[in-house]
Amino acid sequence: MNKQEIFNGLWTITKEKHKACKADAASVDKSHPTERGALQLKSGIYNVAIAAGLISGTDQAIELMSKRFKNLIKHFPDIANYYYTLHEDQKELMEIALYPEVFMRVNFYNTYNTDLEQAEKDGNPQIIFKAKIKKEVLDDILNMWREFRIQNELFTFAFDGKEEK
């Protein structure tokens, strides 16, 4: 796979998930506001994954992903060490294949886990409900992107079940 094919694959599966979730939310009767709101929240998080994790698919998305990746991997020393041993062409593939996951983990993973822990401490059922949805959707996004990488044999060692901080 080349960079564009990797990007297109990640973009397509994320966009499909977003559209399905958005359609599900629209199909729920307004007399069920909790279910509808939960689905709208899920749809919004998938949209964040598209807008931020995949840089909205802009023409410069691949270039920006490559540029930003170098700073973000500092949070994951094992991945960074491996990255710096690669030839340039392999580095470019790794940048695109891992950028969305690295971005979401750095910017949202700890926040969503901390939000859930705090909500559970506070005991507010509505906040717990929202925090669980956020964490569930983020986990789904990360798993979806990881599955894509595994199916395409792209840096399958990264985030292989061991939490990296």
Predicted segment positions?
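Charged, low-complexity interaction regions
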Residues: 22-37, 54-59, 84, 88, ...
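Soluble, cytosolic/nucleoplasmic coiled-coil alpha-helices used as oligomeric scaffolds and tethers
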Residues: 141, 148-151, 155
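Short acidic DE-rich linear segments
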Residues: 161-165
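Long, low-complexity or tandemly repetitive, helically biased scaffold regions used
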Residues: 50-94, 103-104, 108
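Alpha-helical oligomerization interfaces
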Residues: 33, 37-51, 57, 94, ...
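Short amphipathic alpha-helical heptad-repeat segments
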Residues: 3-19, 41, 97-113
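Basic, mixed-charge low-complexity alpha-helical segments
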Residues: 15, 19-22, 26, 71, ...
